[in-house]
Amino acid sequence: MKRRDFITSTVAAAGTLMIPLEALAQSDRRKELLIVANETGPNSLDIHTVGANRPSYGVSWICYDRLMTFGKKKGPGGVTMYDFTKLEPELAESWQVAPDGMSVVFKLRKNAKFHDGAPVTAKDVKWSFDRMVSVGGFPTFQMKAGSIEKPEQFVVVDDYTFRVNFIRKDKLSMMDLAVPVPCVYNSELVKKHVTEKDPWGLDWTKANEAGGGAYKVESWKPGQEIVYARYDDWKSGKLPKIKRIVQREIPSAGNRRALLEKGDVDITYEMPPKDFLEMSEGGKVVVQTTPIENAIWYVGMNVTRPPFNNPKVRQAVAYAIPYEKIMDSAMYKRATRLWGGKDNKAHGTDWPQPHGYAYDIPKARALMKEAGVADGFETTLSFDLGSGTVSEPACVLIAESLALIGIKCRIEKVPGANWRAQLLKKDMPLILNRFGGWLNYPEYFFFWCYHSQDAVFNTMSYKNPAMDKFIEAARFESDRKKYAEDVAGFVNMAFDEVPRVPLAQPNMDVAMQKNIKGYTYWFHLQPDYRDLEKA
């Protein structure tokens, strides 16, 4: 399909008055308009709602304020990136940690207002924090990772003074207050929409924004487009240069690339690795690449379901994965290999790090025989269609290879908007997925992905009390030698029992016009439009 035909057909199919990107670009070349093309957009305007996807994190980041944010530094290749060791003011203009380290007092900006003009007070912060530790699921578990767990920890001192009491000394607590989840809601506005069954107003905030951040949602057509408008009365940082953002969902990678190279789109960050490789070599646009910290592509097996409850079957799968083919044909070498290490032991405290599995069909067949399933079995291999540019070709290669050891896979494509909800069900036997921990510590990754509390991202439903002890010890250990021993303990178990098989550490690639300046790599993998400007 031709690009112009595609644009016309999407507008007609939507049955809306969405302006074609081509017309937007040609009619408004002003510096304050940014046009973005994505494969998948937000499925919710509220990060606290069940199943909110990664693009929803971007809504939270720019439409809501947090008490603090992270500083910046130069990363690999000179790309500007966040600095998790440096906290800076956002809604809070200052803070003071108690001498005993068991509480922190925040002083709020007295001139901050929500998008409807209502003042932001400590009561709003208290209500928002109570909400995030009470709604359950992802937001509650995220804050628990930093020992932020109970409403009783949050205290309104006065209208513009707020205190957080810590239940234990945890190096992640302050950092956890600067991730997307602890955002501040207009509590009085949301309270107008609560019900007995929905005491936190989640149904309303899923489709309605209630923040006071640098941008407000001007319009949202789920599955099609979200439009942001700058909030000119924002006081929690430097007012952004970009006044309006049109973020359009265009499923076809070919169309996104064509629109970008023609100049109809300013930026895209969801493209096949092959396209990023070609565009970086072509020189028409700028491609910025950063290895994603604390992140892996992996094959996960549900250990509660036979035959994946047998470690030997899981090890057989680990030896049957065609790692090199996936790296070459699905990832186009735009990732870091995590297979073929010296052995299945931890080497240092870095994460991710390579395991000792490599492509070895005879060894995989021998393990299948030892497991009592020499004749193989049938299963379903599922992936997120929202990351299909990598996942689909990788799944085809994995299925072809597993067939060599008798495992016949039916490939299931799950729409991106439904993927998180599907993960929550914990009923998919075999998946290809990508996960990255927001806070760059191995114990944080393992707390999310391997701990027996069985968080949403423990997609394998793996539970091992012995590993839990190592994870918990590492979270609070201050002695470096003991910390290294704890990390080695849980990494060694993960490699031996292999409920998930790491494939590669992904890159974050972003392609943009040459006049776009200010891009920053963030751990949540969404562009911070507040930083961008057109030169």
Residue ranges and their predicted role:
Residues 333-370, 387-393:
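Structural transition elements
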Residues 512-535:
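Long beta-strand-rich cores associated with HINT superfamily self-processing modules
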Residues 337, 355-358, 404-419, 424, ...:
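Extracytoplasmic/peripheral linker and loop segments enriched in polar/acidic and small residues
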Residues 107, 143-194, 219:
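Surface-exposed binding/hinge segments that line
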Residues 69-82, 86, 180-240, 244, ...:
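Gly/Pro-rich hinge or "lid" segments in bacterial periplasmic/extracellular proteins
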Residues 109, 203, 232-278, 400, ...:
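Ligand-site clamp/hinge motif
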Residues 93-138, 157, 163-168, 256-259, ...:
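Aromatic- and charge-enriched surface segment that lines or borders ligand/interaction sites
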Residues 37-99, 210-212:
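N-terminal lobe/hinge region of extracytoplasmic solute-binding protein
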